[in-house]
Curated annotation (Swiss-Prot):
Record field: transmembrane: none
Organism placement in taxonomy: Archaea, Thermoproteota, Thermoprotei, Desulfurococcales, Desulfurococcaceae
UniProt name for this protein: Uncharacterized protein APE_1571.1
PANTHER family in alphabetical order: 3-OCTAPRENYL-4-HYDROXYBENZOATE CARBOXY-LYASE-RELATED, FERULIC ACID DECARBOXYLASE 1
Pfam families: UbiD, UbiD_C, UbiD_N
UniProt GO MF annotations: carboxy-lyase activity
GO cellular component: cytoplasm
Family designation: Belongs to the UbiD family.
Amino acid sequence: MKPIADLRSYLEFLESKDMLRRVSVEASPILEIPEILRRIMYRGSGYAVLFEKVKGHEGFRIAGNIFCSLDVVRQALGVERLEVIGERLFEPLKGPPPLGIGGKLRSLGEVLSLGKYMPKAVGRAGFTANVLEGREASFNLIPAFKVWPKDGGRYLTYALVHVRDPVRGVMNMGVYRVMIAGDKEGVVHWQIHKRGMQAQQDSVEKGERRIPAALVIGSDPGTLLTGAMPVPYPIDKHLFAGVVRGEGLPVYRLPNGIHVPANAEIVLEGYIDLEDLREEGPYGDHFGYYDKPSRLFPTFRLERVWHREEPIYYGSVTGKPPLEDVVIGKFAERIFLPAIQTLLPEVVDIDLPPHGVFQGMAFVSIRKRYPGHGKKALLALMGLGQLSLTKIIVVVDHDINVHDVNQVIWAVSSHVDPQRDVLVVPHSHTDELDPATPTPMYGSKLGIDATRKLPEEYGGKQWPEEVAPDPETVRLVEGRWGEYGLD
């Protein structure tokens, strides 16, 4: 299956699945459209919306809730299981090293096959149809959302912020909220643990005052999802987009040297001013609270606006779950499971519960082999990439379905002695957006070992035997069920 070409093709795909509704009456991006999109998701309706008339922005359209269903996302990416996407990168790392010439050639072929996911430079892009610069280039052209009444302004809520890493030269493409602060200024909120902030810090250390940058709005589903993924540094985000898409991403070089997806709807070209640091917020984020950071953030200065004919603006809305970002979080959970299993082979499965707001809570099942294995897994997970920002982690045995919260609750209730099995890690780094920490970015973590205990962990005793029905009686009841007249 060829990857879906762009946002427009993806909307057509959604419409073919009866997952798209069109709104032909005029609607405003200031509070009104965000309220509509939230209401749809809170009702459990689960469909995308295309607003064909946008108040104050003639010629623009707005798409929202485009990631409304994990299964539809899977179909759009053409895979039977979302884990396949992660396996494309990490499966070649598993298994014994090849010894014979045949095995070595196969291994080389697997490595070389990654080349098909590399970005492909092209000389044409649809967004070059319209180029505005000088006085004409303005954030006011863009139908950016004001999501909540007390937000600090209008926000680009799903712009793919492009900056090149100053050390390795790889491309970062992250979803960082951008508060519009003027005609040509936007404040870029990248959190301290993210790759964008790393690029800022490295650039400052090198004595640079600005970073060439681009804000990309609207692309194919695989590329849009990649922007929100916690891709480990220094993997190039354009390369990872190719892995998600199943084919290399076509990219176009802007005058400032930044390569951007050629299928973009809107491109805002400019630079990050590292010396112009400003306040940002408040903004109503995915925890369901207004976030007003205490630190300052760099300013994006707009130089050019590029856009396709009748461009489609895509923006997400945030707030208490479940909203569209829940699907994006579940997508990350699935595609990074193979990576977690490569580093921690004992891991069987993982679940980030929707109301755990991504990094609030995780359930992980493991195949336990020795005393203390549950705590070993907890400590490893607490130090693993973006999972290290997770506040509460519960580890259970391999036979517990982590996607069934009732099974997890049963495991915690029946397997946990709080003094023995609860681990509190104080004075650690935390999610910068967590409203519960007394000091931003610095708090504590909770680990719960809800595995069955081995004798060494249980005072030398054997763990109690679990109840199980008599097999012969089960067969008897199954055979006579119709006689009982119960259903």
